[in-house]
A protein has these predicted regions:
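Bacterial N-terminal signal peptides that target proteins for export
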Residues: 1-12
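A residue-level marker of the well-folded mature domains of exported/periplasmic proteins
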Residues: 23-372
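C-terminal motif of bacterial Sec signal peptides marking the signal peptidase cleavage site
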Residues: 16-21
Length: 372
């Protein structure tokens, strides 16, 4: 299915070029941020680490396979999937990028960052030093840390675009140069999940919810803030815990933190995990805390194979779907469109809606293929 979509996107891009030759130049605009309301539904090396498989990553010394002689075949891209090879969320981002590379012929190299903002900025500098045509980043470090580095890269003629987490000041500054965004609008997505979780759980004012997130991260923390605002507006009492570095890189490291919170607050009725890999580990967390399916209303971000199992088993009740495959696909495509056709940056909101037990079945084959 996604191969067909990608071919269509390439054709649309070519048609757009032809139409552009016959029409006045248009000014790039960004889509208005709106809450997700429809319910259909983070080790690096000193040099870019590259991977060639589409579902089971294996380290290689070259870029992922690309279409020989494709329309973007002379374009060199460094791509940041975010976390670690094989991670439930970032592997799907990677698969989308690999498919885009195959469809366009782009020469793409992949850099894994353990979801560590400091590592991302260091790796960005290393990537820029190789003078690629473009770099597709995860925006977790935020404008303050990233913008001076982006300024330097743009000054060298390197196209930069972001995925998953916006870098809004840099995006506004360099939109005409191809700086786009593919991902959810973070605060709105967080607020929407919090609001939907309250609705589906039936919790009332005064009930306690445990929110495990990344509020301290510039930019990325907006999603956690959105969740908290929605819960507090509904009158829930929020017990908040920042995700530590070890758990951010490896979700299973968070078991002692989770059990400690649940032991200290046995009256908790809801858990929301603002991290795809933590959401996929919710069954492990709850079992370690001595809970049974349905004892706690659990919600979180990002559908994955583990999340599917947790939903089917009654451990996880609600997930907001970022459609992260598209984040990877459009990250590569944006740079190709800008380099080859001089298109400006596109803003693409991939946060489509919610997944729960009622609508899961249709997505299961795609999730198992790591395309959703």
């Amino acid at each position: 299915m996604f191969k067909n979509i990608s071919r269509i996107l390439s054709v649309v891009a070519l048609l757009s070029l032809v139409l552009a030759a016959c029409a006045p130049a248009a000014t790039a605009t960004t889509a208005p941020a709106a809450p997700v309301t429809q319910a259909p539904v983070a080790p690096a090396t000193s040099a870019p680490a590259t991977v060639a498989a589409t579902t089971a990553p294996v380290a290689t010394t070259g870029a992922a396979p690309a279409a020989a002689g494709g329309w973007c075949s002379n374009v060199k891209i460094v791509f940041f999937p975010g976390g670690t090879p094989g991670g439930g969320f970032e592997q799907v981002v990677y698969n989308g990028a690999v498919q885009a590379a195959k469809d366009t012929g782009a020469n793409v190299q992949y850099v894994w960052s353990d979801w560590d903002p400091a590592k991302m900025t260091t790796q960005f500098q290393q990537a820029a030093a190789t003078k690629p045509d473009g770099i597709a980043i995860m925006g977790h470090p935020g404008d303050t840390a990233f913008d001076p580095l982006i300024d330097a890269a743009e000054g060298q003629g390197i196209i930069v675009t972001s995925m998953n987490t916006q870098v809004p000041l840099a995006q506004a500054k360099y939109a005409a140069n191809g700086f786009g965004y593919a991902g959810a609008i973070l605060y709105n997505a967080g607020y929407a999940l919090g609001q939907e979780a309250v609705k589906e759980s039936g919790l009332k004012a005064g009930d306690k919810a445990f929110l495990w997130g990344l509020k301290a991260q510039a930019g990325r923390g907006e999603r956690t803030k959105g969740v908290q605002d929605a819960l507090e507006k509904a009158g829930l009492k929020v017990i908040y815990q920042e995700i530590d570095d070890a758990t951010n890189a490896n979700a299973s490291a968070g078991v002692p933190v989770f059990t400690g919170i649940m032991s200290a607050h046995p009256e908790i009725k809801m858990v929301i995990t603002d991290h795809g890999n933590l959401t996929g580990t919710i069954q492990t967390f709850l079992q370690a805390a001595g809970k049974k399916p349905g004892d706690i209303f659990a919600a979180g971000f990002d559908i994955s194979g583990n999340a599917v199992t947790a939903i089917q088993g009654g451990w996880l009740q609600l997930v907001i779907d970022q459609q992260q495959y598209l984040q990877g696909y459009f990250g590569v495509l944006q740079i190709c469109l800008t380099k080859v056709y001089h298109f400006g940056g596109l803003q693409i909101d991939t946060g489509a809606g919610f997944v729960n037990k009622s609508n899961l079945d249709a997505l299961v084959p795609l999730i198992k293929a790591q395309e959703r």
